[in-house]
């Protein structure tokens, strides 16, 4: 008590605390000077958080575009003289996603534009769930990814792998659907106004695996023929052919190759069934897969707006698999849905050739300003399809 001056202080928010000032007989004692806070701009915060729109946007982009983990984010903030817990980061992201969810209906309308082509794929993730008995454990869940290159939209949908998930989302979609041959998609073969097309890249992978992993020399002939199909597609893109020209060249150049593929496949399977030749298990799988879904694999030749494969969608899945690799899984289903929301807008911005950071900053600036007309906000920030 002889060495320090003691003071009890109450701040403007009502918080009370004590501080000690060392006594110095040689230093002139002066009264405290209080700062006039009205002279400074008070930062505008995103509702339900202590974050500005710019800071929240940085957190979103770092996590969902660059796959930076929470631990690395915390160390980054320490370097900037800031300290923040993981729970605070998660809560801010959750509140930010709650605002963005209101824009997803507009994105979905653009995605399912009648007459357009959508590409669909899915990938697994381990998610912590609580069952009916209250027991907590990890279960395998799926992230469905749907891409529309015409409207430049990407949509992430979290759920199980049951066909009801994608069936309910797509509804009675009128257009063309490109997928692999997973059984959940076969439902769309029954829809009158929906053309289901299967991906040739999946077929090629099976033959490549039979050749490389199983050393089956018979697979190489099919790989070479599929390569000719891709050569035609490269020429279509390089020469900038119209949809009518694409259909014409596919009919003239691709159809003969396709007929050759089918004849060779059925002939090999027939010889195998009569024990005349031996086939590796992987080549059997490839031949059966191709012949079983031949109608869907042939369908692309008649539609000039459809690509030969689903690779554009698989590229959109990759950011999610990077997250899965870095984070290991989701600690809650709510966290999985938050991820789906943010990835939808990150990948849509990339398809539209705009920076995701600019979109999020613009969006949260509107939120802070009090706007809640989400459809108009989405149209103002993104490129609305014609």
Spell out what each predicted region is.
Residues 1-386:
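Catalytic center-proximal scaffold of phosphoryl-transfer enzymes
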């Amino acid at each position: 008590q002889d060495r320090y001056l003691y003071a009890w202080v109450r701040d403007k928010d009502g918080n009370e605390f004590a501080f000690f000032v060392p006594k110095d007989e040689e230093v002139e004692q002066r009264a405290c000077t209080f700062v006039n806070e009205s002279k400074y701009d008070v930062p505008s915060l995103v509702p339900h958080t202590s974050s500005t729109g710019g800071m929240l946007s940085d957190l979103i982009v770092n996590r969902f575009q660059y796959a930076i983990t929470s631990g690395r984010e915390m160390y980054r903030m320490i370097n900037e003289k800031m300290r923040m817990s993981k729970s605070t980061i998660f809560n801010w992201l959750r509140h930010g996603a709650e605002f963005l969810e209101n824009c997803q209906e507009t994105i979905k309308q653009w995605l399912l534009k009648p007459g357009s082509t959508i590409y669909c794929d899915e990938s697994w993730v381990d998610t912590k769930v609580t069952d009916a008995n209250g027991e907590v454990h990890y279960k395998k869940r799926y992230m469905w990814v749907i891409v529309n290159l015409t409207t430049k939209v990407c949509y992430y949908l979290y759920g199980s792998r049951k066909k009801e998930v994608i069936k309910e989302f797509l509804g009675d979609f009128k257009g063309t659907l490109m997928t692999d041959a997973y059984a959940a998609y076969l439902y769309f073969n029954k829809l009158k106004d929906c053309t289901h097309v299967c991906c040739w890249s999946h077929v090629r992978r099976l033959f490549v695996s039979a050749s490389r992993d199983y050393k089956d020399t018979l697979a190489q002939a099919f790989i070479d023929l599929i390569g000719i199909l891709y050569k035609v597609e490269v020429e279509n893109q390089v020469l900038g052919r119209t949809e009518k020209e694409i259909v014409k060249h596919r009919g003239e150049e691709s159809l003969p190759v396709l007929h050759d593929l089918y004849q060779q496949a059925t002939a090999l399977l027939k010889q195998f069934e009569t024990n005349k030749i031996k086939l590796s298990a992987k080549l059997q799988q490839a031949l059966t897969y191709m012949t079983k879904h031949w109608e869907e694999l042939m369908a692309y030749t008649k539609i000039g707006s459809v690509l030969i494969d689903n690779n554009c969608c698989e590229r959109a899945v990759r950011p999610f698999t990077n997250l899965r690799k870095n984070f290991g899984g989701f600690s809650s289903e709510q966290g999985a849905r938050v991820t789906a929301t943010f990835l939808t807008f990150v990948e849509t911005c990339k398809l539209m050739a705009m920076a995701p950071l600019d979109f999020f900053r613009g969006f949260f600036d509107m939120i802070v300003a009090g706007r809640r007309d989400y459809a108009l906000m989405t149209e103002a920030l993104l490129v609305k399809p014609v």
